[in-house]
């Protein structure tokens, strides 16, 4: 086999092997996460958060900037779901983090990525902004307990 052909084959193998190794590392990280997390452990319902507890969360609105500008949970910061890893240095690890989107599906993906990146202090708002709003927003816990009467 000629030296040129051997170099070409070696380069081709390196190109093919690198993504395979990177993918294997990602799979291992996901396996470790799935072994660690408990069912439902990352989700929280709007009615589980008393009004006075909202201020202790770092709240991330994972929707796009136009949806955020139109309406969002008071105190929330806008980090679109695709950008959570790129902007993770602005997300605290020393306080509870709550992440939401419209329904919970995109925020669940963002939350999964953050957990793989080492964030174990976060919760996904089950049902997202739509359910939070439908259940009474910041007053969802009070409504659920039957204390709010209209």
Give residue spans per PLM region:
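Short, surface-exposed ligand- or partner-binding patches at beta-edge/loop junctions that are enriched
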Residues: 100-101
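Active-site flanking residues adjacent to catalytic metal/cofactor-binding acidic residues
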Residues: 60
């Amino acid at each position: 086999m000629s030296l040129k052909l051997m170099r070409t084959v070696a380069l081709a193998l390196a190109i093919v092997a690198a993504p395979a190794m990177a993918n294997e590392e990602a799979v291992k990280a996901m396996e470790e996460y799935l072994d660690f997390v408990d069912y439902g452990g990352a989700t929280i319902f709007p009615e589980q958060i008393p009004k006075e507890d909202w201020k202790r969360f770092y709240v991330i609105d994972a929707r796009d900037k136009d949806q955020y500008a139109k309406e969002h949970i008071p105190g929330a910061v806008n980090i679109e779901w695709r950008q959570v890893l790129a902007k993770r240095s602005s997300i605290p690890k020393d306080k509870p983090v709550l992440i939401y989107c419209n329904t919970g599906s995109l925020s669940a993906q963002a939350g999964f990525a953050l957990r793989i990146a080492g964030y174990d202090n976060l919760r996904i708002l089950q049902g997202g902004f739509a359910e939070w709003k439908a259940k009474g927003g910041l007053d969802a816990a009070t409504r659920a307990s039957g204390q709010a009467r209209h």
